[in-house]
Amino acid sequence: MALIYTRIYAQPVEFNRALGYAYDALVKGPYPFDAMSTWKGLSERVAQGIYMGQGLLIPHTRVSGLQEPLMAFVVAREGITGIKTRNDEKAQFMCVLLSPAESAMAHTVTIANVAKRLLDPEWKEKVLAATDEEELKKMF
């Protein structure tokens, strides 16, 4: 998995804005892919619901021909707004994931690894306390 982009927002951030910046970074990442069809797949997934609990949003889709999973990780201490969560829980983390369409395993393993980290209270606390993107990137 290639972690392409990390971002820390100290203030609340609107979901579409955070997703847009993260997706733009993935498009400019190391592996070419069809940005328009991938965006369509990502948008369809968002419409189905992407809140996983524990404050985590995972907009994700599979991309034909992609060499390895690409990920962007966003932390918003004060929350990500404009997106549906269960019981009005505050979403503070967003993992944008693009996975090779040809490998269901890569997709599943990457999502499981991120979810596992967020279930660790110490890791979650460190991520929320991170002061810059490089520090955040090192936590992966």
Predicted regions and their residues:
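Cytosolic covalent-transfer regions centered on His/Cys nucleophiles
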Residues: 1-140
